[in-house]
Amino acid sequence: MSKKKETDSYLSSDIKKSKDFKIISNLLKINDAVIVSHYYTTPDIQAITEATGGKVADSLEMAKFGKNHKAKTLLVAGVRFMGETAKILNPEKIVLMPTLKAECSLDLSCPEKEFNKFCDNHPDRTIVVYANTSAAIKARAHWIVTSSIAIDLIDYLDRLGEKIIWAPDKHLGRYIQKQTGADILIWNGTCIVHDEFKSQSLLNMKKIYPKSAILAHPESPENVLNLADFIGSTSQLIQAAKSINQKTIIIATDKGIFFKMQQACPDKILIEAPTSGEGLTCLSCARCPWMKMNNINRIIKSLTNKKKHNEINIPHDLQKKALKPLMRMLKFSQKVI
């Protein structure tokens, strides 16, 4: 269940009286920087981000915010592909991360060499890749999407008669295919967090909370999605939690989302969806291990380190290639959001 008291402590104005806030605020001014954080980072990072004028958001809104903000330096708290996306969109800006070792299981599941071979074997197909991919994979794609616009884009391409390659998340790919009926070849990747949600355990929890609603991210397995009252991206799940009638909500996504979700609906009871069957040990336990690598001390070190060991750099040619499908994504998102 959500730790409401802990969340409330981060929501209070006391955060601005903390030593960390004063240090980070000063470093942000010195570096002409702003923090952009994902919903899956820890509550203290999300609170510091908002208190210093930064943005906590999903991948799409992170990209938009970083591109439109006047700061010369972006501190991206999330996983590596998010920092790369920020750099692709803002080659003139310095892009820092708390650590460059924060990977993503979806990104790792789609190696460049293997994916290029897969695409070469299907030259007649339009390549659509999830934002959770490396700069090299993005550069190979025709389109890039986040989960918030994936169905809209695939439906659009399907109406144009396009046959599609989708990578890397197989669960999201199957969900999109089911929703649109599009002709899609799906790469076999998964998210370490969402892949662990189990339908039987979810059914057992539903028996304990029979009046609850289930909200699920589409990176979850199909049998979990079949039990959900609402399926959507992180930002869409937060909106659903606000509008849904039930007071008790079971959440099948990374528990980092609870911070902003509890802000949005403080009267709701949020419960973590189970991540394993009885007697089994979970690997992620509804918390991305790489997102947890982001912490306040690393943010301070990244902003302090003048050698910029945690700076994202992308070769110019690769940046130019990856920028094209990213800009298509941003332009398309303006039409559907």
Swiss-Prot record:
Q: Which parts of the sequence bind [4Fe-4S] cluster?
A: C104, C191, C288
A single Gene Ontology biological process assigned to it is: 'de novo' NAD biosynthetic process from L-aspartate
Q: Which reaction does it catalyse?
A: iminosuccinate + dihydroxyacetone phosphate = quinolinate + phosphate + 2 H2O + H(+)
Which terms in the Gene Ontology molecular function aspect does this entry carry? 4 iron, 4 sulfur cluster binding; metal ion binding; quinolinate synthetase A activity
* Localisation: Cytoplasm
Q: Which UniProt keywords apply?
A: 4Fe-4S, Cytoplasm, Iron, Iron-sulfur, Metal-binding, Pyridine nucleotide biosynthesis, Transferase
Residues reported in the UniProt entry to bind iminosuccinate: H38, S59, Y130, A131, N132, S147, H217, P218, E219, T234
User: Into which EC class is this enzyme placed?
Assistant: transferase
**UniProt EC number:** 2.5.1.72
UniProt superkingdom? Bacteria
Q: In which pathway does it act?
A: Cofactor biosynthesis; NAD(+) biosynthesis; quinolinate from iminoaspartate: step 1/1
What is its cofactor? [4Fe-4S] cluster
Which Gene3D superfamilies does the UniProt record give? NadA-like
Q: How is the cofactor bound?
A: Binds 1 [4Fe-4S] cluster per subunit.
Q: Which GO terms describe its cellular component?
A: cytosol
- PANTHER family in alphabetical order: QUINOLINATE SYNTHASE, CHLOROPLASTIC (PTHR30573:SF0), QUINOLINATE SYNTHETASE A (PTHR30573)
Function, in words = Catalyzes the condensation of iminoaspartate with dihydroxyacetone phosphate to form quinolinate.
Q: Which family does it belong to?
A: Belongs to the quinolinate synthase family. Type 1 subfamily.
Name of the protein this chain belongs to: Quinolinate synthase
Q: Could you tell me which species this protein originates from?
A: Wigglesworthia glossinidia brevipalpis
